[in-house]
From Swiss-Prot:
This protein's GO CC annotations: plasma membrane
Name of encoding gene: pcs
Places the protein is found: Cell inner membrane
Keywords, in A-Z order: Cell inner membrane, Cell membrane, Lipid biosynthesis, Lipid metabolism, Manganese, Membrane, Phospholipid biosynthesis, Phospholipid metabolism, Transferase, Transmembrane, Transmembrane helix
Gene Ontology MF: a single term: phosphatidylcholine synthase activity
Species of the source: Rhizobium johnstonii (strain DSM 114642 / LMG 32736 / 3841) (Rhizobium leguminosarum bv. viciae)
NCBIfam families (alphabetical): PhCholSynAgro
Protein family according to the UniProt entry: Belongs to the CDP-alcohol phosphatidyltransferase class-I family.
This protein's name: Phosphatidylcholine synthase
Parts of the chain on the Periplasmic side: 37-41, 98-100, 155-159, 209-214
Biological-process GO terms, alphabetical: phospholipid biosynthetic process
Keyword flag Cytoplasm: no
C-alpha cells in the first residue's frame, strides 16, 4: 500500500521552473538592498541592486531558450518579472532617496511617495511600448535616476526638480530609449549605455569620490540616455536605415 503517490516531474518542467526561481531571487537581493539602505550603507545597497539588475538582464533570454511559457503555461513569468521590477526599479530606489534625506524634510518623503505611486500607475499601462520598442513616457527607471543623484551628490533643489520632471514625464507621450530593443542608432545607444554603466561601477568602487573627468562623462552619457528617445521621436528620419 502506497502512502504517498509521487508523480515524476519531467526534466523540462524542472528546468523551466528553475528560471522562475532565478527571477524570484531578485526579490531577496532587493531585500538585502533594503537592509543596507536602512542602515545607510548606500554603497552596499547599490551593489545589491546591481546584482539584482544582472539577474533581471539574464533571466529573460534563458526563459526564452528553455521555452518557459510553453512548458509552464499556468505560471506567469511576466507577472513575476513585474513584481521584481517594481521592487528593484522603484521601491528600493525610492526608499534609498528617502533614507538619505537628500532632499530634506518633508520633501524626501513627498518625493518618494510621488515615485512609488506614479510608477504603480505606469505599470498598469498596457500601451507603454511603441511599435519601435521605445517607452512611451518615462519608464520609471528610478534605479538609474536615484543612482545618478547619489553619484553627482545632487543638491536638494536639483534632486527634487529631477524627480518632479520625471514623474510628470511618466504620463506624457514622450519617447524614452530601450537601449537594446530600439534599432535606430543601436550601436551608439549601446555604447553610451555600457560607458554609463562602467562609469557607475567605477564611481561605486571609488565610494562616490569620483574624479571630475569621470563625473562629467557620467553626466553626459546619462543625459544622452534620458533625452535620445525624445530626439528620435521628433526627428523620425534620424538613425533610420536607407
Amino acid at each position: 500500500m502506497k502512502i504517498f503517490n509521487y508523480k515524476r516531474v519531467p526534466y523540462a518542467e524542472m528546468r523551466a521552473f528553475s528560471v522562475h526561481i532565478l527571477t524570484a531571487s531578485g526579490s531577496f537581493l532587493a531585500f538585502l538592498g533594503v537592509v543596507a539602505a536602512a542602515e545607510h550603507r548606500f554603497i552596499d545597497m547599490f551593489w545589491w541592486l546591481g546584482l539584482a539588475l544582472l539577474v533581471d538582464g539574464i533571466d529573460g533570454p534563458i526563459a526564452r531558450k528553455v521555452r518557459v511559457k510553453e512548458v509552464l503555461p499556468n505560471w506567469s513569468g511576466d507577472t513575476l518579472d513585474n513584481i521584481i521590477d517594481y521592487v528593484t526599479y522603484v521601491l528600493l530606489p525610492a526608499f534609498a532617496l528617502y533614507q538619505s534625506g537628500m532632499i530634506g524634510e518633508p520633501w524626501s518623503f513627498v518625493a518618494a511617495g510621488m515615485i512609488v505611486v506614479s510608477s504603480a500607475i505606469y505599470y498598469a499601462d498596457m500601451g507603454m511600448k511603441t511599435d519601435e520598442y521605445f517607452f512611451s513616457g518615462f519608464p520609471v527607471v528610478w534605479n538609474m535616476i536615484v543612482f545618478t543623484l547619489f553619484v553627482i551628490d545632487a543638491s536638494a533643489t536639483t534632486a527634487l526638480t529631477v524627480v518632479i520632471v520625471s514623474v510628470v514625464l511618466t504620463f506624457l507621450p514622450i519617447n524614452f530609449l530601450h537601449p537594446v530593443r530600439v534599432k535606430r542608432l543601436r550601436p551608439l545607444n549601446l555604447g553610451v549605455f555600457f560607458l554609463w554603466s562602467a562609469l557607475g561601477i567605477f564611481s561605486l568602487l571609488m565610494h562616490f569620490d569620483t574624479p571630475e573627468w569621470a563625473l562629467i562623462l557620467f553626466i553626459v552619457t546619462g543625459a544622452y540616455l534620458y533625452v535620445i528617445g525624445a530626439v528620435l521621436q521628433f526627428f523620425p528620419a534620424l538613425g533610420r536605415e536607407t
